[in-house]
Amino acid sequence: FKRAKGRIQMGGRIVVFGSYVTDLTGRGTRFPVPGETVLGASFQMGPGGKGSNQAVAAFRAGGDVTLVTKLGRDAFGRAARDFYTAEGMNTGEWIEDETCETGAALIMVNQQSGQNMIMVLNGACSHITPEDVRAKQTLIEQADVLLVQMEINVGALEHVIRIAHESGVRVILNPAPVQKLADEMMAMVDTVTPNETEAAALTGVEVVDLNPPTARRRYF
């Protein structure tokens, strides 16, 4: 795992409650067809997951960032801690579960076309319990901004959003990968950051241009 050099400082306490997975990326000249084995050109292992990626990006931009995620007590979990320690980031709020494995993303990249195929195995991030969330309630309540995604189980996501909303914390939702949230929960979100596909899935309104349609503005 490698880290980038340099960061700036800025104010505001940011809590990212989301996923960490280890990215396992293989590159080759073509994808195998079902039942076929092909030789690849290169392999890379590194930190990933939408929650982790956004936490690292915000930290490198100068934010006061704490990531809350769940990992297994395994080699991938230890590698994650090593990476975050090298970044200078806080890992004290991470949840460990020896009964679960750390999540992983299996990524194949076609070097000729640039296309990829990805299978995400969320592992421990799919097993965040109500007790896990309650243990982080004070941390969430004291944040200025809560950033969440949809790579954790929906029950935990809704619990986290409700705590933040009731505490007056600004909630930003990156709705990826899209899962159904009750309208009541969407009303507790201050900012939603969908791409075109995610916006259409959430609203039922097809994206025909990149200017925000009136119907979508009304929804959000």
Language model features with spans:
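Alpha-helical segments flanking ligand/cofactor-binding loops in enzyme cores
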Residues: V56, R81-D82, E158, R162, ...
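Conserved phosphate/ATP/ADP-binding segment of small-molecule kinases
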Residues: I161-F220
